[in-house]
Design a protein with these regions (language model features):
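Intracellular juxtamembrane helix-capping segments at the cytosolic ends
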Residues: 121-134, 336-351
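Loop-to-transmembrane helix entry/capping segments in MFS-fold secondary transporters
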Residues: 48-49, 136-149, 261-262, 351-363
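C-terminal ends and interior cores of transmembrane alpha-helices
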Residues: 87-102, 301-318
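Helix-loop boundary and gating motifs at the non-cytosolic
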Residues: 2-64, 227-268
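Helix-to-loop junctions at the C-terminal end of transmembrane segments
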Residues: 65-78, 165, 278-291
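Glycine-rich segments within core transmembrane alpha-helices of 12-TM secondary carriers
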Residues: 144-165, 364-374
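C-terminal membrane-cytosol helix-exit motif in multi-pass small-molecule transporters
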Residues: 189-208
Length: 378
């Protein structure tokens, strides 16, 4: 079975492999910023409310431009947008690092806003590109591999950050490089900049002229709005719930069970590995058990894990409380994430070809909105 699963991913179109490498490279930067950028900001003297305000700007960038982009790219080639994303994200990442280092607040704000825009370009364009470049036989594999890049980048970035922190410094003659947050972020940003080499090698066929929508202001009749809202309503509920809970899970374990950042990082590494494995199993499960089992049942189990984790606060003084909470946490994330590839495939097929770019943009906007609200709540 494992050999069959491996071959199904190996036999994907070359452009999908290039897109996956592009997503992985940019995700390295994204993960590194999530893991240590806030620590870097705090060490530079910024308060927690200021840090939350900076982070909210990257979601504003995605919120403001995702919907217009989704309308604009219908029927257009997506390679130029991937190239633009691979230029914007590393450049604005460097701008964030240096503006934080020198405490230039206006530049920090501009860089966060632009960084969010760059990541949004990749996210909004990836889903329709995958659907365009695959068939019904291998679209689940492509979407699953795309979903797995985030967890793989989490593992790789986490190991690299921990390794460089453990080494401490590098001496070459009279030159010494200290591996602090500033230098580590720069190293990973340079690694992420290699994404441009994958973007320029992507090839696309001609798109149908009849699918193009060049008028951003005449969209009422261009899309099946009732179908779109029906399709996206479950995602609205899931994104709101995730945005209001997941960003604070580390605080929950710290305040209720006394877990340190090191302990929680270890849990994060375990869950990232499981997310990667579970994501790769999605095509096999979807083809064997169908969408109902792969999406509805799996997400219901993930929600149950979240509820169990919260209930364990009532039993924090008992030794079994933390054990059950940790098990629920480790299982929740892989279960919820393994439903995403199948859900995205079902969503794109349900809304039809002419609505796919817009539904991808709306999906990105919803997740950005949920994290923006979380940043403001914090």
């Amino acid at each position: 079975m494992l050999g069959k699963i491996f071959r199904s991913y190996r036999d994907l179109p070359r452009v999908i492999h290039l897109l996956i490498l592009l997503e992985f490279s940019l995700s390295l930067i994204h993960v590194a910023f999530i893991l240590i950028l806030n620590i870097f900001l705090r060490k530079q003297g910024f308060s927690d409310p200021e840090i939350a305000s900076f982070n909210s700007l990257r979601f504003i960038g995605a919120l403001a431009f995702a919907l217009p982009l989704g309308i604009y790219i219908r029927g257009k080639k997506l390679k130029p947008f991937f190239i633009l994303a691979t230029l914007i994200v590393p450049l604005t990442s460097g701008l964030i690092i240096e503006s934080v280092q020198h405490q230039v607040v206006p530049l920090i704000q501009l860089a966060f806003l632009s960084w969010g825009f760059g990541m949004m370009l990749m996210r909004v364009c990836s889903l329709p590109f995958i659907i365009r470049s695959t068939s019904a036989e291998n679209s689940t594999e492509a979407l699953s591999l795309s979903a797995a890049t985030w967890s793989l980048a989490t593992i790789f970035s986490g190991v690299l950050i921990s390794g460089l922190d453990w080494v401490g410094y590098l001496t070459l003659g009279v030159w010494t490089l200290i591996f602090d947050e500033h230098s580590i972020l720069w190293i990973i940003t340079v690694l992420g900049a290699t994404s441009i080499f994958f973007a320029v090698r992507i090839t696309e066929g001609e798109q149908e002229d009849t699918a193009r929508n060049d008028d951003l202001f005449s969209i009422r009749k261009s899309y099946d709005w009732s179908l779109i809202f029906k399709a996206i309503s479950p995602l609205i509920l899931i994104s709101i719930g995730a945005g209001l809970t997941i960003p604070f899970v580390n605080l929950f374990f710290n305040s209720v069970f006394g877990l340190t950042s090191s302990n929680f990082s270890l849990l994060g590494s375990i869950t990232a590995f499981l997310v990667f494995i579970f994501s790769l199993l999605v095509p096999f499960l979807r083809k064997k058990y169908g969408y109902w089992m792969t999406i509805v049942v799996v997400q219901a189990l993930a929600i149950c894990c979240l509820v169990i984790m919260a209930i364990m606060e009532l039993y924090a003084e008992f030794s079994f409380g933390i054990v059950i909470a940790v098990i629920a946490f480790i299982l929740r994330q892989p279960l919820m994430h393994m439903a995403h590839p199948a859900a995205n495939e079902l969503l794109m097929n349900y809304v039809g070809k002419k609505n796919q770019e817009l539904i991808s943009a709306l999906s990105s906007s919803l997740w950005s909105a949920s994290w923006f609200v979380s940043a403001k709540v914090f």
